Swiss-Prot record:
Organism of origin: Bos taurus
Source domain of life: Eukaryota
Family note: Belongs to the MEMO1 family.
A Pfam family the protein falls into: Memo
Quaternary organization: Interacts with ERBB2.
Protein name: Protein MEMO1
Sites of Phosphotyrosine modification: Y210
Gene Ontology terms: biological process: regulation of microtubule-based process
InterPro entries according to UniProt: MEMO1_fam
NCBIfam families: AmmeMemoSam_B
Keywords of the record: Phosphoprotein
CDD domains per the UniProt record, alphabetical: MEMO_like
Function: May control cell migration by relaying extracellular chemotactic signals to the microtubule cytoskeleton. Mediator of ERBB2 signaling. The MEMO1-RHOA-DIAPH1 signaling pathway plays an important role in ERBB2-dependent stabilization of microtubules at the cell cortex. It controls the localization of APC and CLASP2 to the cell membrane, via the regulation of GSK3B activity. In turn, membrane-bound APC allows the localization of the MACF1 to the cell membrane, which is required for microtubule capture and stabilization.
Length: 285
């Protein structure tokens, strides 16, 4: 049996964010130093996955709520941008590299998830092509640096799930969300507007286009704060907002709903929507 350790390279370093460890560390420290921790310790966060030039300061609002002293496992749920998936997929590697330090995948939890029969395996090529998970790795490493040898990650690529599948995966992940030492990171940008995205919703009553987009996204964020997956699904059906992480968000909302059935109380708060011309937000449970 081979004991070879398989690594996923930081394939977007040098383009979506700097490949220089010292420079990246300084950038992350700068963004984090500008925000306060008001919901700490968070049990789940939603943060964007665009290039750090566009979303670095926004993501800091979410990662500032992470408490490294109690967090031991970090589930990272990112949408699939390049391959069609009707389920969720697990990585085939052991280590995710970042310019700061390497992050270890929790093979014990991976084994538990794989045994359910609900998951696929993504190839290394698919893994390295996808940015939705990778963009959270440097921030994860930075937020956890004081306990960097004491935590593992559980990356999950989320496909175009049906509502029933979102419920199934939400129920599965709810037992992990219930554990205080586990953190869920949901990777999502909000509205993608224009010909490139085949989406041009415009409410003239809001004035300029960016104001219409701002109103649309705020509406979605308000519904997410209600922690009601049905209302969120209805919002998407009505407005077709191009929230790329809608399925990971749906899974998280269904996991929370499952816990609420058992009496657990949670609240969700959006901290910042950054520049509305960039249409991003950060949130924490």
């Amino acid at each position: 049996m081979s004991n070879r350790v398989v690594c996923r390279e930081a394939s977007h370093a040098g383009s979506w964010y700097t490949a220089s460890g010292p420079q990246l560390n300084a950038q992350l420290e700068g963004w984090l130093s500008q925000v306060q921790s008001t919901k700490r310790p968070a049990r789940a966060i939603i943060a964007p996955h665009a290039g750090y030039t566009y979303c670095g300061s926004c993501a800091a609002h979410a990662y500032k709520q992470v408490d490294p002293s109690i967090t031991r496992r970090i589930f990272i749920l990112g949408p699939s941008h390049h391959v069609p998936l009707s389920r969720c997929a697990l990585s085939s590697v052991d280590i995710y590299r970042t310019p700061l330090y390497d992050l270890r995948i929790d093979q014990k939890i991976y084994g538990e998830l794989w045994k359910t029969g609900m998951f696929e395996r993504m190839s290394l090529q698919t893994d390295e092509d996808e940015h939705s998970i990778e963009m959270h790795l440097p921030y994860t490493a930075k937020a956890m640096e004081s306990h960097k040898d004491e935590f593992t990650i559980i990356p999950v690529l989320v496909g175009a799930l049906s509502e029933s599948k979102e419920q199934e995966f939400g129920k599965l992940f709810s037992k992990y969300l219930a554990e205080p030492s586990n953190l869920f990171v949901v990777s999502s940008d909000f509205c993608h507007w224009g010909q490139r995205f085949r989406y041009s919703y415009y409410d003239e009553s809001q004035g300029e286009i960016y104001r219409s987009i701002e109103h649309l996204d705020k509406m979605g964020m308000s519904i997410i704060e209600q922690l009601d997956p049905v209302s969120f699904s209805n919002y998407l059906k009505k407005y077709h907002n191009t929230i790329c992480g809608r399925h990971p968000i749906g899974v998280l909302l269904n996991a929370i709903t499952e816990l609420q059935k058992n009496g657990m109380n949670m609240s969700f708060s959006f901290f910042q929507q950054a520049s509305w011309r960039r249409r991003m937000g950060a949130a924490a449970v």
